[in-house]
Amino acid sequence: MKLWGGRFKEEESKLMEDFNSSLSFDKKLYYEDIKGSIAHVKMLANQNIIKEEEKEKILLGLEEILKEIDEGILKIEGDYEDIHSFVEINLINKIGNVGKKLHTGRSRNDQVALDMKLYAKKSTEEVIECLKELMDSLIKVGNENNYIMPGYTHLQRAQVVTFRYHLLAYFEMFKRDEKRLENALEFLNESPLGSGALAGSTYNIDREYTAKLLGFRKPVDNFLDGVSDRDYIIELISKFSIIMMHLSRLSEELILWSSSEFRFIQIGDAYSTGSSIMPQKKNPDGAELIRGKIGRVYGDLISILTVMKSLPLAYNKDMQEDKEPFFDAKDTVISCLKVMEGIISTLKVNKENLMKSVKKGFLNATEAADYLVNKGMAFRDAHKVIGEVVIYCEDKNSAIEDLSLEELKQFSDLFCEDIYEFIDYKNSINKGIKKEMGYF
């Protein structure tokens, strides 16, 4: 049974049936579809478009279908065009011809737009919750490991930071991601139900009532816009892409830090794998997969942008292709956030190796230049002097703080005994605005 066909003389080909069907993926929307239908039926009865007893029969049937799907009794499968057809046809089979009144005053165009809005709202809230859990772990692990470590530019040791402060940089990125998603919820807060195919309905539909029942702030202002745009899907996948970019950057650093060349951290066994041939290997596959999966989400964004490009108003079948990219992007970002939270919460930090790396990198060179500036030298001159000191140290395989005062005075008479206190790593990180890094 199809929900259309009266004007056709010939049957749809099996090839076209299979090509046209979206049930294999839009079955994810069954909950939203049924909840939308429940609100629609209540509104129809309130507006005296259907009888009260008809409403009760339809509601009972819809609730039974939802329960049977949730319990695995009713499988979402078969030769149905989409999830809307599946629900409506099963409703008619369950309660009889009264089920045919479900679709009164409604099109699949506003129906699917509603389903996607509801699903997108729920998905956004799920991603926000995953972000919060990851941010909590970043703070907790950072506070537990507030050790001095090298900060990098160009992947070269640059200045001293702390492990905690480094993790907090990612906290700030994810905090902005959370804010972006919270802002996006505003655009998801308008209900398209009642827009019909594109031009509303001749029935006295109460769109405000259904919008309130379904948790929306208001109905959409324009019927055409309500059924024909998916900019909110594009926006969400764009925001998911930014989250994935941040996750990928963090993954790359965790991969580097866990390598034998760095040995700053050890990723837990629960988020690592081994080699089928090399017994000694412990591979950071969780982080590597997160880094790799960014391509999927970027691809999903390009896919939906391409689908919507140049589409005339209102609904076009092209828009059926909005679902798989969104479902994939949402599932991917959630799984990556959960795995990253697991990696962060179980990693071990090697305090000694962090400090060894600090001492090897002349990370107090800037502070040494600042010392000379405090003694009256112009910064550019101080920069040159300390550069020469670094060359001298490299030739001697020594650190700046290990040079004698006599050696330092070869470069400037401004050096005094207090240089050693000034360039001490633990002291310097608590000087000036650096105190904001919160080393304790």
Curated annotation (Swiss-Prot):
The keyword Transmembrane does not apply. Pathway: Amino-acid biosynthesis; L-arginine biosynthesis; L-arginine from L-ornithine and carbamoyl phosphate: step 3/3. It comes from the Bacteria. GO terms for molecular function: argininosuccinate lyase activity. GO terms for biological process: arginine biosynthetic process via ornithine; L-arginine biosynthetic process. Its EC number is 4.3.2.1. PROSITE patterns: FUMARATE_LYASES (PS00163). Keywords: Amino-acid biosynthesis, Arginine biosynthesis, Cytoplasm, Lyase. Pfam families: ASL_C2, Lyase_1. GO terms for cellular component: cytosol. Gene3D superfamilies: Fumarase/aspartase (C-terminal domain), Fumarase/aspartase (Central domain), Fumarase/aspartase (N-terminal domain). Belongs to the lyase 1 family. Argininosuccinate lyase subfamily. NCBIfam families: argH. This is Argininosuccinate lyase. It comes from Clostridium botulinum (strain 657 / Type Ba4). The gene is argH.
